Amino acid sequence: MASLLDSVTVTRVFSLPIAASVSSSSAAPSVSRRRISPARFLEFRGLKSSRSLVTQSASLGANRRTRIARGGRIACEAQDTTAAAVEVPNLSDSEWQTKVLESDVPVLVEFWAPWCGPCRMIHPIVDQLAKDFAGKFKFYKINTDESPNTANRYGIRSVPTVIIFKGGEKKDSIIGAVPRETLEKTIERFLVE
């Protein structure tokens, strides 16, 4: 390990450009000033990143000037959360019969778990579909950790799983986080029947 550290050299971005020379006639060293070339550093401020141009003039222990030129670009934009989203209600085992099996319109049920990453990806899609198909379709979510009886009854082995019920019967199921278009086409297929 010691031999490895001995062989590694690290270049410094700023070194003090001080050239001291001692003349034979005086005991005080003379100092020459040199301008250091600008260095660029990546700077983060919230969701923006930019390169900062830092310029320094150095002298022996006095007057250091720093100029920072900033110009940024957005690294990541936050999603618009101001739109009123439809919150799809959660179901429990006790509500299953009346809300899903006895429904007069088709029902889409999303089986999910709080620890499931793909479930969090599909939640906004199901919420948006509930808004788009309001009145034509009912939408519910059921937490498989809190309602294991219903999940076992329908053989849910992986989450997210979306099941469509019509007339109290299971008609179709989709396993995994799928694109919105896949869910939309499946819903539309049951609207024309």
UniProtKB/Swiss-Prot annotation:
SS bond partners: C116-C119
Organelle transit peptide: 1-82
Compartment(s): Plastid, Chloroplast stroma
One Gene Ontology molecular-function label: enzyme inhibitor activity
Matching Pfam families: Thioredoxin
PANTHER family in the record: GEO12009P1, THIOREDOXIN M4, CHLOROPLASTIC
Catalytic residues, chain numbering: C116, C119
CC annotations in GO: chloroplast; chloroplast envelope; chloroplast stroma; chloroplast thylakoid membrane; cytosol; thylakoid
Similarity-based family: Belongs to the thioredoxin family. Plant M-type subfamily.
Signal peptide: none
Matching PROSITE patterns: THIOREDOXIN_1 (PS00194), THIOREDOXIN_2 (PS51352)
Lineage, broadest ranks: Eukaryota, Viridiplantae, Streptophyta, Embryophyta, Tracheophyta
Protein name, per record: Thioredoxin M4, chloroplastic
Residue numbers marked as site, Contributes to redox potential value: G117, P118
Role this protein plays: Thiol-disulfide oxidoreductase involved in the redox regulation of enzyme of the oxidative pentose phosphate pathway. Under reducing conditions, inhibits the glucose-6-phosphate dehydrogenase.
Classification via Gene3D superfamilies: Glutaredoxin
Domain Thioredoxin, residue spans: 83-192
BP GO annotations: negative regulation of catalytic activity; positive regulation of catalytic activity; regulation of carbohydrate metabolic process
Keywords recorded for this protein, A-Z: Chloroplast, Disulfide bond, Electron transport, Plastid, Redox-active center, Transit peptide, Transport
Keyword Secreted (UniProt): no
